[in-house]
């Protein structure tokens, strides 16, 4: 990446200095040209004097304003050289400023490209966020359905467990009744065992044998109560 260019205030000051230097150089060149013309006209000699004027002046002496004009011409030449040096410095600074300006333009172009890339990435991120929001909504709806199904399954399981408990209690009660009936049956059998030793008359042909008290007791109202199998809980 290019180095940062000079500050804007400094650049304007340098440009103003360049303008002033150019103006002073032009003024100095104009002054030097005027002084040169005056010196040249003075060197060519004065106009023809009137008769009797300056009769006492020596013929080899220069006019009175030539030395002053030569001094002013030398000063103007020095100022012109100084202004030329300043102009060269201003030109060098101008080249540096142009170089810095090109570097700034290059940086601006790269920053613009990066900004465009960031905008594209931001748009893509927004699109992905919208898609993820829709997917999250669908997942939330599915989760709600699953929770409702799980709640219904839990309710059914609780109902089944409750029914299993009721059936188990009924089975235990039935088993208790069956045990009581068996105990009573055993007592009756014990009481009837002496009566079995007495010989009974043979039944007539065609008549059905009367059922024994044991068979009647076994075919009682209990009907062989069976204990229901326990269901595995949860």
Curated annotation (Swiss-Prot):
Coiled coil: 66-163
Keyword Signal on entry: yes
Ranges of biased composition (kind: Basic residues): 197-217
Leader peptide range in chain numbering: 1-42
Domain of life: Eukaryota
Keyword terms: Coiled coil, Signal
Annotated segments matching region Disordered: 44-67, 187-234
UniProt feature, compositional bias: Low complexity: 187-196
This protein's name: Coiled-coil domain-containing protein 194
Organism: Homo sapiens
Originating gene: CCDC194
């Amino acid at each position: 990446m290019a180095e940062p260019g000079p500050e804007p205030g400094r650049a304007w000051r340098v440009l103003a200095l360049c303008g002033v230097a150019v103006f002073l150089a032009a003024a100095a060149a104009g002054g030097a040209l005027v002084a040169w013309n005056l010196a040249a006209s003075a060197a060519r000699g004065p106009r023809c004097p009137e008769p009797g004027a300056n009769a006492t002046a020596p013929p080899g002496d220069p006019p009175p304003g030539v030395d002053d004009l030569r001094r002013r011409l030398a000063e103007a030449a020095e100022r012109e050289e100084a202004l030329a040096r300043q102009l060269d410095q201003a030109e060098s600074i101008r080249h540096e400023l142009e170089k810095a300006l090109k570097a700034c333009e290059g940086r601006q172009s790269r920053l613009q490209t990066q900004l465009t890339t960031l905008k594209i990435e931001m748009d893509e991120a927004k699109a992905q966020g919208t898609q993820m929001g829709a997917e999250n909504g669908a997942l939330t709806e599915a989760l709600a359905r699953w929770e409702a199904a799980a709640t219904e399954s839990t309710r059914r399981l609780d109902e089944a467990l409750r029914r299993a408990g009721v059936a188990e209690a009924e089975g235990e009660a039935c088993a208790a009744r069956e045990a009581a009936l068996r105990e009573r049956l055993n007592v009756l059998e014990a009481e009837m065992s002496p009566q079995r030793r007495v010989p009974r008359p043979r039944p007539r042909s065609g008549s059905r044998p009367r059922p024994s008290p044991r068979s009647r007791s076994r075919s009682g109202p209990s009907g062989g109560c069976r204990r229901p199998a326990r269901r595995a809980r949860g």
